[in-house]
Amino acid sequence: MSCSCFGASTVRQKRSDRQAHQPKQVEEGKHFTELLPGRRYEFVSISITFGAFAFWFFILHNNGALHAKTKNFSYNELRAATNNFHRSNKIGRGGFGTVYKGILRNGTEVAVKTLSAESKQGVREFLTEIDTISNVKHPNLVELLGCCVHGPNQILVYEYLENNSIDRALLGSKRSIKLDWKQRSVVCMGTARGLAYLHEELVPHIVHRDIKASNILLDKDFQPKIGDFGLAKLFPDDITHISTRIAGTTGYLAPEYVLGGQLTMKADVYSFGVLTLEVVSGKSSANINYGGGQKLLVEWAWELYEEGKLLDLVDPELEEFPEDEVLRYMKVALFCIQANASRRPAMSQVIQMLSKNVRLNEKELTSPGFFEDSGGASGKPSKHKSSETSTSHQMSSVPITITQVVAR
């Protein structure tokens, strides 16, 4: 059986509310099959049946509407395109599935993301991803081309982006591409524009919840596109925050979200700040060996900032770069990762700050927050810029201050 693909609908939020407890149920089911191995195939069969039912239920609630540019792919078509999902065509692994490169019969290159019916995300996140992006078009968002359901196989088909993801291009020991500063600045600015569109222009607004280097893909011209919307949450205009289960990637998670489950758009802003530090430094936020000790990237960046040595964070691979501009990008990142969520700028402000349209008021900058695996969040006051202790537990209403540059 193949699915139909469909545009955004007014029942998105209702569906999310209705299925809020599904992850727990799946976890329990998984545990049950481990206790009773003989029941495993029965459970898988139930999962497949439920998945099929959920798709058709969703279609009925959308009056069977199809988005004009999405396609209903057959399983055989995608299997042929990927050479039977051969490991040589594997190009990555997203938050909810393995991604393969495929070539359709007409020669079009595509990215084929396969999800298993046994995986913990189940139907909920699969439907979320389709529902979220099938009707969303922006130069800095990955385009969904279509989908397919065949037995236990849930498959999404995206446009193929030649230069893979930022983490493969920049982070780790096996860098595949050498990006100069101009290209890196384009990555940061393009990602900021994509997030600003999701947060402020789209209605209902969307919080991505999993902004990270592996979810920022590069096209043939090295323009960035945000992908992997499996964790996305919709925000109606009258909602300021959502209480939700914690989901995302360690190293990018805002402390107030980890500790309290309070999700706002400022969680994406925090993740963007971490991503920007990674792009400038060429170092992964997942490591904890920076600055000559057990430090996270955000800790090290703040330490260097306080010492007036922020340029020491810059990737040694960057042989030539405009120091003032690179410093600006790193300081904007520090504004984004402040422990106090209300002090972080909106993404539209971030775009202005990156583009030199505003002067950064560093007197308003307070220390970053970060979540440690040991179970705590930290936010240390600046040694010389502010006497205010700013932690994820103290939520101030003081907004970020930015001063317009006045032409002489």
Predicted regions and their residues:
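Intrinsically disordered, low-complexity cytosolic regulatory tails
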Residues: 1-68, 322-332, 339-408
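Protein kinase glycine-rich loop
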Residues: 88-99
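Glycine-rich ATP phosphate-binding loop
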Residues: 100-117
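Regulatory alphaC helix of protein kinase catalytic domains
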Residues: 126-131
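A short, aromatic-enriched beta-strand patch in the conserved N-lobe beta-sheet
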Residues: 146-147
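A conserved loop-to-beta-strand element in the N-lobe of protein kinase catalytic cores
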Residues: 151-159, 163, 167-168
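Conserved catalytic-loop aspartate of Hanks-type protein kinases
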Residues: 268
